[in-house]
Amino acid sequence: MGVSEKAREIAPQYGITYRTPVFAIHKKGHYGGIVGRPFENMKEYADLVKEVKKRGGDFIKIMTTGIMNFDTDGSVTEKPLGFDEVKEMVHIAHEEGFSVMAHTNGARAVREAAVAGADSIEHGNYVDEEAMWAMKENKTVWVPTITVVKNMIGCGRFSDEVLEKIWETGSRNIQRGYEIGVQLALGSDAGAYLVPHGQGIKDEWECFQEILGKNNKEVTEMLLEGESKIQEKFIRR
């Protein structure tokens, strides 16, 4: 921990706008230990939010679900946190002046995170229309990070048959989300397997072009708006 704080400190020297949650926050015993700090109850969670504030964090990142199970199409690695718990987590962060970025997968979990007030959904794999409408109606920005799947096809680490199905499902969902009017934004999940920093966001852009059409001015404008909303939301007031 602390690397992102150092990165933010030196970023202006390179012309980079760098914002950080300092660390992600996850429920003890659930996914998130690789990037964050755990809590067992709401008091511990609130204390972690206050620590982020003390250390100058720009926003709060919470982990409400596991990750995709790449061995099978359509499943997430663990049961999501409950709605009431997520709602309280978002409320506490908002009360401290933070926006909330939620690592969330699965239709019900995405829908509930959006309704709970999460400002953005990172990943959002396996959403359904109800979840998409929830994101639209609650002005939640959706950052699909679909390049994580695309870049692994053909690498031999997982079944290409499964990866292709996940890619096709994700592509259809992005297309439908765009049609519905969900605010989409580019994000790469850089640091994931075969998603290097810098190149990852270029790969994500290429995925969106493949899904929504190359040289589509409306798509470009929509994604620029999404980037603007992310920059606007994720800075501590």
Task: Name each region found by the language model.
Residues 1-5, 26-27, 66-70, 105-111, ...:
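Active-site environment of divalent metal-dependent phosphoester hydrolases
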Residues 95, 168-237:
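His/Asp/Glu-enriched, well-ordered alpha-helical/loop segment
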Residues 115-120, 136-142, 181-183:
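Glycine-enriched alpha-helix->loop->beta-strand junction motifs that scaffold or abut catalytic
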Residues 82-93, 101-114:
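N-terminal active-site wall of soluble small-molecule enzyme domains
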Residues 19, 100-103, 122, 141-143, ...:
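Structural detector of well-ordered beta-strand residues that form the stable sheet scaffold
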Residues 1-91, 143-145:
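Divalent-metal coordination cores built from histidine and acidic residues
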